């Protein structure tokens, strides 16, 4: 019994769900039929009144007729239809004061900047909202009446006459150096630099081209005296030759090509017998006076011969 009751309840729930699904499907199908049965001309009807300008005025009681989707014609007042136009008009009215306030702020900033720099407000023109390029003009008019500088006038003349520079170069004239100091006087510069600059430093001047200034004798003497008074540098090496005491310079008429090599001084007998303990003693050169004959045992160079054992034996035998 209980199982039969449960089965009957389940069957009733399934039937309800199926009936609910059928009702929802029937509603959707009916809605689609209503949409498809409507004429396409009604969907794309005349809506030109939505694009009317804001300034156009309509009668307060004028109404517009519109068709809904299967609901028939509905009358709407002009105030409701033009609500979007009023909103746009309000937004436009609020945007205009904001633009004016922004322009006033920009003008105040320009005036403050110009007064701080000591210039007039006309020197900084501004274009707001016209679509043109804003900024400083290339050649602003001289409305204040201030005199222009010479460099600007020269630049304007050269810009107006571009062939002038080419003519000057073709004639061989030097190009002028603008904003440069004038050349000093020749006599004044000669007295100031003490003879160090005898030529002008500017090669572009046509007055000194090919001219050499010859210094005077007085100027040369002054330069020589100044160089003599200048102290010698202690760090420089001396140019005097260093004389070695052990060497002798030859006489001026002596020929170096015929000079004989230096000879070794003779040694005594004591040096041969005991050269380590006995110091070497050099015999003085005893040259005979001029006009006398030299001894047979004395050589021509004045040095004595070595007294060996043979000479001693001959002397004893004699």
Curated annotation (Swiss-Prot):
Keywords for the protein's UniProt record, in alphabetical order: Phosphoprotein
Sites of Phosphoserine modification: 249, 257, 260
Biased composition (Basic and acidic residues): 7-20, 99-110, 150-168
Keyword hit for Transport: no
Biased composition annotated in UniProt, kind: Polar residues: 50-61
Location of region: Disordered: 1-24, 38-318
Transmembrane intervals: none
Other noteworthy facts: The P/V/C gene has two overlapping open reading frames. One encodes the P/V/W proteins and the other the C/Y proteins.
Official protein name in the record: Protein W
UniProt source species: Sendai virus (strain Hamamatsu) (SeV)
């Amino acid at each position: 019994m209980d199982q039969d009751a449960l089965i009957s309840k389940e069957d009733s729930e399934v039937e309800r769900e199926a009936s609910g699904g059928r009702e929802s499907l029937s509603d959707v199908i009916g809605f689609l039929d209503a949409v498809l049965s409507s004429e396409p001309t009604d969907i794309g009807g005349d809506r030109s009144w939505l694009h009317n300008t804001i300034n156009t005025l309509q009668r307060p009681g004028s109404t517009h007729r519109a068709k809904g989707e299967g609901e028939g014609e509905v009358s709407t007042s002009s105030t409701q239809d033009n609500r979007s136009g009023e909103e746009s008009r309000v937004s436009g009215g609020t945007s205009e004061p904001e633009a004016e306030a922004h322009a006033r702020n920009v003008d105040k900033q320009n005036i403050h900047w110009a007064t701080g720099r000591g210039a007039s407000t006309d020197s900084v023109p501004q274009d707001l909202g016209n679509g043109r390029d804003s900024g400083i003009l290339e050649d602003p008019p001289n409305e204040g009446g201030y005199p222009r500088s010479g460099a600007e006038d020269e630049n304007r003349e050269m810009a107006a006459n571009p062939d002038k520079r080419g003519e000057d170069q073709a004639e061989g004239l030097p190009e002028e150096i603008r904003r440069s100091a004038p050349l000093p006087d020749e006599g004044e510069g000669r007295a100031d630099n003490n003879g160090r600059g005898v030529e002008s430093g500017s090669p572009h001047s046509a007055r000194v081209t090919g001219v050499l200034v010859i210094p005077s004798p007085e100027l040369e003497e002054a330069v020589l005296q100044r160089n003599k008074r200048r102290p010698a540098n202690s760090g420089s090496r001396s140019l005097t030759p260093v004389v070695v005491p052990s060497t002798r310079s030859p006489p001026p008429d002596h020929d170096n090509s015929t000079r004989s090599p230096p000879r070794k001084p003779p040694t005594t007998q004591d040096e041969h017998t005991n050269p380590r303990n006995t110091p070497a003693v050099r015999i003085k050169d005893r040259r005979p006076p001029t006009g006398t004959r030299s001894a047979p045992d004395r050589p021509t160079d004045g040095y004595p011969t070595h007294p060996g054992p043979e000479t001693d034996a001959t002397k004893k035998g004699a």
